[in-house]
Curated annotation (Swiss-Prot):
Start and end residues of each stretch annotated as Disordered: 24-118, 133-160, 172-585
Bias type Polar residues, positions: 34-46, 81-91, 138-160, 177-196, 209-224, 254-265, 550-563
Organism: Saguinus oedipus
GO cellular component, one term: extracellular exosome
Primary gene name: SEMG1
Post-translational modifications reported in the UniProt record: Transglutaminase substrate. Rapidly cleaved after ejaculation by KLK3/PSA, resulting in liquefaction of the semen coagulum and the progressive release of motile spermatozoa.
Name of the molecule in the record: Semenogelin-1
Annotated family: Belongs to the semenogelin family.
Main location: secreted
Pyrrolidone carboxylic acid carried by residues: 24
Pfam families (UniProt xref): Semenogelin
Amino acid sequence: MKPIIFLVLSLLLILEKQAAVMGQKGGSKGRLPSESSQFPHGQKGQQYCARKDKQHAESKRSVSIEHTYHVDIPDHDQTRTSKQYDLNAQNKRIKSEKHAAGSQEPFNHKQEGREHGKSKGDFHVLIIHHKRGHAPHGTQNPSQDQGNSTSGKGISSQDSNTKERLLALGLGKEQDSVSGTQRNGTQGGSQSSPVLQTEDPVHNKKPETQNSLQNKGSSPNVNETKQKHSSKVQSPLCSAQEDRLQHGSKDVFSKNQNQTRNPNQDQEHGQKAHNRSCQCSSTEERRPNHGEKGIQKDASKGSTSNQTEDKMHDKSQKQVTTPSQEDGHRANKTSSQSSGTEERRPNHGEKGIQKDASKGSTSNQTEDKMHDKSQKQVTTPSQEDGHRANKTSSQSSGTEERRPNHGEKGIQKDASKGSTSNQTEDKMHDKSQKQVTTPSQEDGHRANKTSSQSSGTEERRPNHGEKGIQKDASKGSTSNKTEDKMHDKSQKQVTTPSQEDGHRANKTSSQSSGTEERRPNHGEKGIQKDASKGSSSNKTEDEKHDKSQKQVTTPSQDQQSGQDADEEEDLLSHYQKDRHQHRSYGGLDIVIVEHEADDDDRLTHHDNNQNSIFT
């Protein structure tokens, strides 16, 4: 609207100046659209023009459009013609072109003006052509308008055009904002300054008609001209939608919002100051067969978690979690945290809920519910990371829960501030076994030397109501875990850890733990090795079919910038006792799985740096 207002104001100023000039020259004034044209007396053809203007004013009062015709005061012996051509009434235009006689011309103009009044309920074009030169027939045609010279024509035509432009803006109709003076500017080569316009000599009727049609050809669609002008005013930032506005679409902002709206956008906050973290939250949720409910919520502040749930139908379940997490820390001495959350929900009305609301870190919750027994599992690990300037500590907590058949419940909560505790509950099918592993993780953080720790927790549950949960909540790294459960006796697990840790601080170390598990059939052994930066964890889980045994390996990594912590997990079952011994060799944790036939044994192991009690 601002360009239109400026243009109107500039035209009004120009009209006032030329009105003063015309008052000095001939005393003629610019005529308003509602007024009749005022011309000085004693000149030929003025009565006809005034009469014709009155007739147009009467025929166009319904739509407030008038056609102005002006008399050239200095050159009153020369004929000046001004014609109007309607886009919707081309046949009338042809008639007006064909009739050269002056007696029939006013009737054509009357009919043309009346049909403009009828056809312009929503659309009208006003073209005023000021022709200069001698008449081709050498006679003054009373049916033709008497044009005027540059001074008189400029005032009256611009005044009427300005008024019509104001009417077009006030009525809100789709009319040509570029009025007759700008059409004349199109002929003369000037639209911005319609005061001084080059006038073509009228040799006959057809050149005038062609010139007027060329003026139409310059803007063939009045709606396009109006909408182009309005699109620049209403949506200056949306230049891509001028094509739509040219084709009649007026809802600019709603279409912009519909186009630019993306519900799965990742939000990245660039860090310019110290101790800032990138945030990127993407929540994925999958619901399997038979009315199951799976809810995952991930609101991570300072980290990124991607959750993927894949649920299969009867007995073959496959889950692929590929969280790609990027922490761009540009502050001095910052740590990045990432968490991978996996969730699986089987058949028959089971419910699984994951919530992850971590401030400065990301906690991953994994719920796995199985087929026949309709188990329920809720994991809520909360992670807190104390990041300070020049002294930052990164903490990661992996929470694992396992719930077997027969309506058993296992709840794990991990709220570690400065440390991470991993709890694993394993409940079995027939014998209803329970196994809790609680390794406590300690992070030795030194000033100007920060280390990021990641704990990968993996669980797998075989067939017959078993559950497998993998969790990887790594700070300063990202681990992607994939749980794959197969049909009867064959289980498959694919772990794809993509870990990206952008530490741009002075003296920061990022460590990533990728956990992979694979469980074959009938007492086979699967060994996982993870060579992380500064440490590696190897996990071995052995699951068997007939006895419905379950083995949970929860290695928690204590990573100091020069220290490796040992963790041991003892998994007790009624049929087997799995003894995991972690031996640290310069940053490598080797897991040796020994299967014994003892029942209900408990073992307490004291590490060098930790006291991990496994019950």
